[in-house]
UniProtKB/Swiss-Prot annotation:
Acyl-CoA transferase; part of the Fusarium detoxification of benzoxazolinone cluster involved in the degradation of benzoxazolinones produced by the host plant. Maize, wheat, and rye produce the 2 benzoxazinone phytoanticipins 2,4-dihy-droxy-7-methoxy-1,4-benzoxazin-3-one (DIMBOA) and 2,4-dihydroxy-1,4-benzoxazin-3-one (DIBOA) that, due to their inherent instability once released, spontaneously degrade to the more stable corresponding benzoxazolinones, 6-methoxy-2-benzoxazolinone (MBOA) and 2-benzoxazolinone (BOA), respectively. The lineage of its organism: Eukaryota, Fungi, Dikarya, Ascomycota, Pezizomycotina. This is Acyl-CoA transferase FPSE_08120. Disruption phenotype: Shows significantly reduced growth but does not affect tolerance to benzoxazolinone. Residues 1-33 form a transit peptide.
Length: 456
């Protein structure tokens, strides 16, 4: 970060800006102008990008993470324009390259090395380099990459990076501006810090599985890695915040995220009901613990989720269903009463929903303004008109695919002025090793020797 000479000392522009705001009359106008100019120019990578660039164009990220939470985080940052270098194990790569579904193998070119849809889902817009962490030369390569980077992301067990000589203290000494983002199962401190991090385990221990499933049934795991991806979302926001803090203060910092804490934070109102009222949470299936009716109702052919969040919506729903008399039924006049008598209300509404097809109900609900939606399978989800309208399915060229391209799910957030989206498809294992090493100054002979020695 730019430093300025002030009263014989080198001080941060952020301090100087605070000083001139507090002492405007004692600071010459030329000095104020110079300080403001230097302050606003100190981190060019975070200046406003043009419409042809991503919001994070110029930010360099070294991604040492594997599987889902970390790669999901770095893919979001890559979609926003960051240059992400994915460091993988020699010969094997990210574990998810090998997580192939039945029947999937035939869609990939065998000569392209290990690859899967699971890996492709969270690794686009990245370059891949393979490095042997077990060799000192490999660890030195990692240091060489981090020396000029803005962010490093890793999801090893706490203490692993330190044992490799790649801990935060080492990296901070090498690059004081580095944002070190560590992700683990339980965080850097506490009695469980050395345990591995797994999505279903965090979901179990931090309460999610306890509240998920049918009322009288067993706990049910979400159909996606919800805790993993939520942790990636939290971490990507923390990294952006750390970058903004660095633009202000000039130095990087450590960011510490965990699956366990992510899931604890997601308990929100359910958690506060226990903490403040001592009310234990229950499983409610598709129902809402505080609102009735709100459920997945079986129609003649599929399920429809709908509900009424207030008395006006309840009256409108009753009218739409042709049961206006239930509006004034003393059991259902207010939401607390409807919650108290939810089973009786569901028994009355269930046969009505079962009398029509999902398409017939959608036609009735569409103009009503009531909250509703069919439970869609994957075919219906990706055929949804809103999916197409928001460009949420994108064809990406990919030579590893037999078809020459694969379809991926587009970025969830759109920017008004900055470019987001797909620049490159998911990389083959080690696809960019040579070009990355050339960028840090290695010649062809040295690269060949490293390859021969199993360092890359």
């Amino acid at each position: 970060m730019a430093r300025l000479l002030f009263s014989g000392q080198r001080l941060r522009p952020s301090f100087l800006r605070s000083y001139i705001r507090a002492n405007p009359s004692s600071t010459p106008s030329a000095t104020r102008a110079a300080i403001n100019y230097r302050y606003n120019s100190n981190n060019a990578a975070l200046q406003s990008a043009s419409s042809s660039q991503g919001a994070l164009t110029g930010i360099k990220i070294i991604d040492l993470s594997r599987v889902l939470a970390g790669p999901f985080c770095t893919q979001i940052l890559a979609d926003y324009g960051a240059e992400v270098t994915k460091v993988e194990a020699v010969g094997k790569g990210d574990d998810t390259r090998h997580w192939i579904m039945a029947g999937e193998k035939a869609s990939w070119n065998e000569s392209s090395g290990p690859i899967s849809n699971y890996f492709a889902a969270v690794n686009r817009n990245k370059r891949s380099i393979t490095v042997n962490f077990k060799k000192a030369e490999g660890r030195q390569l990692i240091l060489d990459l981090i020396k000029d980077a803005d962010v490093v992301v890793e999801n090893f067990k706490p203490g692993t990076m330190e044992r490799l000589g790649l801990g935060y203290d080492v990296l901070k000494e090498l690059n004081p501006r580095i944002i070190y983002a560590g992700l683990s199962g339980y965080g850097r401190t506490g009695p469980y810090r050395t345990r591995g991090g797994y999505d279903p385990i965090a979901a179990a221990e931090a309460g999610l599985l306890h509240v998920t499933g049918e009322k009288n049934g067993p706990p049910v795991r979400a159909g996606i890695g919800l805790v993993d991806m939520s942790t990636g979302l939290f971490l990507h926001g923390a990294i952006l915040s750390a970058l903004i803090a660095r633009a202000r203060d000039g130095t990087g910092q450590r960011v510490d995220a965990s699956l366990f804490e992510t899931q604890l934070s997601l308990l929100t109102n359910v958690g506060l009901a226990w903490l403040n009222l001592g009310i234990e949470a229950e499983r409610w299936g598709c129902q809402h613990p505080s609102i009735a009716p709100y459920d997945a109702f079986k129609t003649r052919d599929r399920y429809l989720v709908c509900g009424a969040t207030n008395d006006n919506q309840y009256a409108a729903l009753c009218c739409l269903l042709g049961v206006e008399h239930l509006v004034t039924d003393p059991r259902f006049i207010t939401n607390p009463l409807r919650v108290q008598h939810r089973e009786e209300l569901a028994a009355l509404l269930g046969p009505i929903f079962a009398s029509k097809t999902i398409d017939e109900w959608i036609a009735l609900f569409e103009p009503s303004g009531l909250p509703f939606g069919p439970i869609n399978n994957m075919e219906a989800t990706f055929a949804h008109p809103q999916t197409a309208a928001r460009d949420m399915v994108i064809d990406v060229p990919m030579d590893a695919a037999c078809a020459g391209s694969i379809k991926v799910i587009g970025p969830a957030v759109k920017f008004g002025d900055s470019k987001t989206g797909l620049r490159t498809g998911p990389p083959r294992l080690g696809q960019h090793t040579v070009e990355i090493l050339e960028e840090i100054g290695m010649d062809a002979e040295a690269i060949a020797k490293y390859k021969e020695d199993g360092i890359i």
